C-alpha cells in the first residue's frame, strides 16, 4: 500500500493521531521521499523543532521511522537523517488490535467476576469488598451504596471482543 493510500485511510489517520498527537500530526501526515533532517521538516512545516523531534521519536519508537547519524567533520555536530517506514503501519495496527483484544478480555473477566456498588450521588463505583469496608456508605459524600448491574457493559464488551476476534481471525479462547 502506497503512502498516499495509507494516509487517506481514516483508521490510519486516527492511529497516527493517537501516536503523535495534534502537534505531531503534520509531521506524520507529510512523510517526505527519502531522508530528511528534523530541521528541514520543522522549516518546511512551520513547526517548532522540539515538536518535530517529539513526533519523529514517537514514530521511531513505533517502528514507523528510522534514522542514521552523520557527524560533521568540521564542527563535530551530529545530524540525524530520518526516513519514514509507513509500510509497517498495517503490522503495527494488527499488534495494537491484539493488545486491545487482550485488554478487553481481561476487563470483561474483571467485570463479570466482581460485584459492584455505586453511589447515586457522586457516581463513585466500588467492588463488594470496598463497599463492605465502608459499611455500604460512600466515603466521599456519605450517600448509600447501591448494588450495580453491569450486564450491559459486559455485553457491549463481548460484542467488541467478538468483532475484534472476527477481524483478527482469532478463535474464541476456551476457559
Swiss-Prot record:
GO molecular function: DNA binding
Keyword Aminoacyl-tRNA synthetase: no
Disulphide connectivity of cysteines: none
Region forming the signal peptide: none
Pfam families (alphabetical): TFIIE_alpha
Keyword set includes Acetylation: no
Subunit structure: Monomer. Interaction with RNA polymerase subunits RpoF and RpoE is necessary for Tfe stimulatory transcription activity. Able to interact with Tbp and RNA polymerase in the absence of DNA promoter. Interacts both with the preinitiation and elongation complexes.
Function of the protein: Transcription factor that plays a role in the activation of archaeal genes transcribed by RNA polymerase. Facilitates transcription initiation by enhancing TATA-box recognition by TATA-box-binding protein (Tbp), and transcription factor B (Tfb) and RNA polymerase recruitment. Not absolutely required for transcription in vitro, but particularly important in cases where Tbp or Tfb function is not optimal. It dynamically alters the nucleic acid-binding properties of RNA polymerases by stabilizing the initiation complex and destabilizing elongation complexes.
HAMAP family: TFE_arch (MF_01909)
Protein name, UniProt field: Transcription factor E
Gene that this polypeptide is encoded by: tfe
